[in-house]
Amino acid sequence: MIQLGDICTKASSNIAQKDLQNCDGVYPIYGASGLIKHVNFYQQENPYVAVVKDGAGVGRVMQLPAKSSVIGTMQYILPNIGVSVHYLAYAMEHMNLAKYYTGATIPHIYFKDYCKENLHAHNIDEQYHIAHMLDKIVDLISHRKQQLAKLDELVKARFVEMFGDPVRNPYGWEIRHFEEISTLITDGEHVTPRRVESGIYLLSARNVLNHAIQVDDVDYIDQTEYARIAKRVVPQAGDILISCSGSIGRCCVVPDNFKFQMVRSIALIRFRKQINPVFAEWLITSDDLQRQILQAATQSSQANLFQGRIKKLRGYVPPLKLQDRFADFVVKINRQKLTIQQSLDQLEVLRKSLMQEYFG
């Protein structure tokens, strides 16, 4: 075994993003979120690895090109002679450098701490082979994600084709407030629920994605706590969930046979029978409704969308038979997405397995 510090060195940047305004050029400069702009100078002649050392995203690893730079919140990591920069980037990604952060207000990591990370010693040919194998997996993962995104775009296009743009409403559908076409608009439990290690799902806003519920990082309650919260609301299949605190406006339909409760960062809408839940889900995620949601949000330290504002959201109401036809189309697309997602999940498992094998 060797240590990370045996195969690379650090270098620093003193560039502030605010100083880049009048530096237009052809050389890329990067920050924690990626490319900032192209400027008329560069700091690194050769490809290198960069690590977010301060602030949001601390520990994130990027492989960046020759003749480029990073701003001062990033750390240059320069491979030694005989070390593949591509291999170095994968090795550092596997190390999960965020675990070294210090500082409560602004997290920070130091090279002097993470340079002691252990890894297997590989010669340059082995490094190239490892990077090549991982590249193939990453390319396949990227392709699967693109396939999923294209299927979502296909559904969006079908929605507009069948119902028209929600803003222009070319077919002249009736426009109604949500409170007029629903039997229930509420939110989750306001009193902090008593959580347990396992049991019944307790969802919060982070678990509500667009068109899906994510339970990789979820809390649990027991049956007693569920029964207490259920006196207020019992979620049902076909209800619509909306994230209403922080990152607001994400929306999905409650699936069949899914028992859960929720905290107040989720809103629930139960539409009348004239509204197909799948149609409602895609209406709410349309650009028009997302604009309405942002305009309706209250701003404090984080955005919030309250029940009263949700009731006043407006959308068109096409004939139910047309909504049902759209829902049938979505079901077919979801079958394709499931197959692709299963392949994507397998590729992610393979990638993690190879990373563990190569880097320990």
Spans of features found by a protein language model:
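Sequence-specific dsDNA recognition surfaces
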Residues: 5-46, 62-65, 69-71, 179-192, ...
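Short, solvent-exposed loop/turn positions at domain surfaces
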Residues: 103, 142, 189-190, 229, ...
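Glycine- and charge-enriched low-complexity intrinsically disordered segments
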Residues: 278-290, 295-298
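Short, Lys/Arg- and Gly-enriched loop/turn segments at beta-strand edges
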Residues: 248-255
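A short glycine-rich beta-alpha junction/loop motif
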Residues: 2, 68-75, 105-125, 244, ...
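Non-catalytic DNA-recognition/assembly elements of restriction-modification systems
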Residues: 1-15, 19-31, 118-132, 143-188, ...
